[in-house]
């Protein structure tokens, strides 16, 4: 599902950068370019969940990023990093994942290494790891 995450990240980035509507969130050409089966319902569902879920919860996601990133305002963050972070936070907070939550962070790091700047992977790892630790601490306190 890594390829689907990459496509979702690209769409989230594109919508943010172009300030465009999400009317056509399902870019068939991109999906076909990746060799993914556009008729596969699980692929469509996963992709739509990532994109729609991120934007439907954007205010909450951004507040979490602001709380964890201390001296970094969202305006100062690289737009690629912000798109990866938003999708990563959505995945950690809202998706049931078959593997560990750490695997979600690893996915975000892989995307950052390919599409981000020199230190994007470290920046994203730090923020998502801090969020995961906060989540684990909240669970332990209950």
Swiss-Prot record:
Entry keyword annotation includes Transcription regulation: yes
SUPFAM superfamilies given in the database record: NusB-like
GO molecular function: RNA binding
Keyword Transcription (UniProt): yes
Residues passing through the membrane, by range: none
GO cellular component terms attached to this protein's record: cytosol
Similarity remark: Belongs to the NusB family.
NCBIfam families: nusB (TIGR01951)
Protein name: Transcription antitermination protein NusB
């Amino acid at each position: 599902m890594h390829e689907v995450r990459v496509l979702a990240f690209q769409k989230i980035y594109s919508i943010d950068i172009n300030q465009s509507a999400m009317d056509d969130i399902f870019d068939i050409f991109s999906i076909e370019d990746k060799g993914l089966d556009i008729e596969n319902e699980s692929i469509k569902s996963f992709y739509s969940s990532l994109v729609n879920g991120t934007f439907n919860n954007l205010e909450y996601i951004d507040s979490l990023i602001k709380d964890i990133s201390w001296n970094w305002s969202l305006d100062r963050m690289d737009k690629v990093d912000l798109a990866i972070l938003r999708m990563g936070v959505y995945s950690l907070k809202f998706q049931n994942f078959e593997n560990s939550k750490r695997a979600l962070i690893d996915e975000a790091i892989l995307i950052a290494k390919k599409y981000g700047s020199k230190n994007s992977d470290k920046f994203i790892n730090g923020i998502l790891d801090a969020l995961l630790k906060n989540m684990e601490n909240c669970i332990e306190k209950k």
